[in-house]
Amino acid sequence: MTGHPDCPGFDDLPRAHGEVTCRGRIRVSPEDFRVDEILGFEPTGQGEHAFLHIRKTGENTDHVAQRIARLAGVKPMDVGYAGLKDRHAVTTQWFSVRLAGKADPDWRALESESIAVLRHTRHDRKLKRGALAGNRFRIILRGLEGVCDGLEARCAAIRAAGVPNYFGPQRFGHGGRNLQEALRLFADPRRRIDRNKRSLYLSAARSYLFNRVLAGRVEHGSWNRGVEGDAFMFTGSNAFFKTDKLDEDIQRRVEALTIHPSGTLWGRGDPVISGTALAMERVALAQCAEFREGLERCGLEVGRRALRLPVPDLEFAGVEDSACELTFSLPAGTYATTVLRELVEFDPQGWPDT
C-alpha cells in the first residue's frame, strides 16, 4: 500500500498475535476461496422486486448485474446488490431487480458454466448497498511453508481475543492507487470526477487514517482493551458510548467481546474521545494533515469503527499435503485478509480488488 511517503504496506501493519512463521498461497483456484453472503432477512415472497440468489464462479458482480438488467429489460440502476464480491472466487449473493407490473422472465436464461440461479422470489424493497448481515468464508491455503504446526493454536487465540479490525488492501487499490487519487482530489476538490470513484477515493483515505490509529493501539497493546477516554462499540452494532471511568464492568464486557474500543473514521465533527485515547490518536495522525484536512473539506462527517474484530466461529482443518482449510464468518464491512494475516504470511497485492 503506497501513494504517500508515510503509508505503511498492509503487511507492515503490526500483528496482534505475534509474528507469523508460516507462509502460504491464497486463491490458487476460484474454488479455494468461497464466500456465501448472509442476507440477514428473509424476502417476503411478494412485491415489485424480484430477488435472485445466485452462485457465480470467476464472475464480476457488476457484470452479473448487467446481465440481469438485460434479461429483465430494465435499466442497470433498477438492479441492486448488497456488496461487491471477489471475482476470483466461488461466491453466492443476492440481487434484486425492479419489475413493477411485470412478470418474471425465465431466470434460467442467466445460467452458464459460471452462473447458477439457486433461488428466486419477490420482496417489497430494492436490495441496497450494505444491506447484509455479513459473509461466510471457506478458504483453502496451499503451498504452506515454514513452521506451520502452530496454526491451530493461533486459531484458538483468535477465537478468544479477535483480531485488529484493519481495512484490507482491497480498500486501497493496487499499489495504493486509491490513496494517490485521493491526494489528487484533495489538491483540486472541484475536479470533475465520477461520484462512485469519488466515494471510493475518500473511503480509502479515511480507511488509511483508521489503520494508522489502530496500528498505534496494537503497538501499545490496547487494541483489545480500553484506555481512559475511549468510546466503546457494541458487537454487531454501530452504536457506541463514551465513558470516563474504566470500571470492572467495562473491562469485563471488553474481555467477553461484547463491547470494543473504537477508532475515529475521520471527518467533520466531534470525535467523542478524550484523554489518553485522544492523545494516542493525535500521535498516530500527526503526520497526516493532508488527509485529515482533505476529508473535512470534502464534507465527510466523523464516524467510529471498532478496533477489534471478533471471529468466534473460526475453524481450522489440519495441514495435509501442504494445504489447510479455514472457515469463519464476518460482519459486513470487514475483511478476511485481516484474519488471514494473523495466521500466515501471503502476498496482499495478490489479493484482487473487491
Curated annotation (Swiss-Prot):
It catalyses: uridine(13) in tRNA = pseudouridine(13) in tRNA. Pfam families: TruD. One of its GO terms (biological process) is tRNA pseudouridine synthesis. CDD domains: PseudoU_synth_EcTruD. The keyword Isomerase applies. Keywords: Isomerase, tRNA processing. It is an enzyme of class 5 (isomerase). The keyword Membrane does not apply. Its EC number is 5.4.99.27. PROSITE patterns: TRUD, UPF0024. GO terms for cellular component: cytosol. It comes from the Bacteria. InterPro entries: PsdUridine_synth_cat_dom_sf, PsdUridine_synth_TruD, PsdUridine_synth_TruD_CS, PsdUridine_synth_TruD_insert, TruD_catalytic, TruD_insert_sf, TruD_pseudoU_synthase. One of its GO terms (molecular function) is RNA binding. The active site is at 86 (nucleophile). Disulfide bonds: none annotated. Residues 162-309 form the TRUD domain. HAMAP family: TruD (MF_01082). Belongs to the pseudouridine synthase TruD family. Responsible for synthesis of pseudouridine from uracil-13 in transfer RNAs. This is tRNA pseudouridine synthase D. It comes from Methylococcus capsulatus (strain ATCC 33009 / NCIMB 11132 / Bath). The gene is truD.
